Regions:
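Short amphipathic, basic-aromatic surface patches that mediate peripheral association
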Residues: 5-34, 171
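Beta-strand-rich domain onsets/edges
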Residues: 101-165, 170-176, 190-191, 234-249
């Protein structure tokens, strides 16, 4: 499995994604926007078909990507997830913009209390990939009840070109309406147009996507709300993304 931060979909040309327990942190090249202070490294979660947790193997960090193996010892569907929860702050220091990401516990220590133009957001981000050995199963797909999540109606490893797939989006375990969904097919560097598909969840949190062709797709959902916000944050930003493979019929 490859994990990277890139500008073009499914190409490794920027920096590796840093994950706890994958490779040595000292091997990872420096990266991130100017003025961004150190951010927490997320943990990789691998859920087996029976719902148990599995450890990654042979992890390494390269110049442009992190890599690891997953032993598919069970038949069924595995869920690979990277989730991050915390705070994001921005302010000015000596006239220069500063940004910070971290935990609520470290906020008071790392961020000046009277920082100029201080803005604080409560953030939760989740990225997922689904892998199936043999017939698809559903036990590993159960939501955690935290942040913005995908609850499949159509199995994520049972997607076909020309067919509609249905998903339900949850916020803290409950269906959420009006979530903006963006779906982009891979190979965008070879197209003049992005080919983006836009959709929005209905009142029951449901959305339907029809895949125009076979291939790899990036699906992203974002939501900004003032519900469930804890101080010092004034808003909540939640995002979800998944890499999906669509097969020819």
């Amino acid at each position: 499995v490859d994990a990277a931060v890139s500008n073009d979909l499914f190409y490794f040309e920027h920096v590796p994604m840093r994950l706890k327990g994958i490779g040595e942190a000292a091997q990872a090249p420096a990266g991130g926007p100017p003025g961004m202070r150190g951010r927490p490294v997320p943990e990789l979660q691998i859920i087996a078909p029976d719902g148990s947790k599995v450890a990654a193997q042979n992890g390494a960090i390269g110049r442009y990507r992190s890599t690891f193996d997953v032993q598919l010892s069970q038949k069924g569907t595995y869920k690979l997830a990277v989730a991050n929860n915390g705070l994001f702050a921005s302010w000015k220091e000596n006239g220069q913009p500063r940004r910070w990401m971290g935990t609520a516990e470290s906020f008071a220590k790392d961020v000046p209390a009277k920082a100029e133009g201080l803005k604080v957001s409560q953030t939760s981000n989740r990225m997922e990939v689904f892998v199936t050995s043999g017939a698809p199963s559903t036990d590993a797909l159960s939501p955690t009840g935290q942040g913005l999540e995908l609850k499949p109606v159509t199995h994520p490893n049972d997607l076909f070109a020309g067919e509609a797939a249905e998903f339900v989006f949850l916020l803290d375990g409950k269906p959420v309406a009006d979530v903006e969904i963006s779906v982009i097919p891979g190979g965008n560097r070879y197209r003049d147009e992005l080919g983006e598909i836009k959709a929005k969840t209905d009142k029951d949190g449901k959305v339907s996507i029809t895949w125009p062709e076979a291939g790899m797709y990036w699906m992203e959902a974002e939501l900004t709300t003032d519900k469930g916000v804890s101080k010092p944050a004034t808003e909540r930003r939640a995002s979800y993304s998944a890499t999906l493979e669509v097969l020819a019929p």
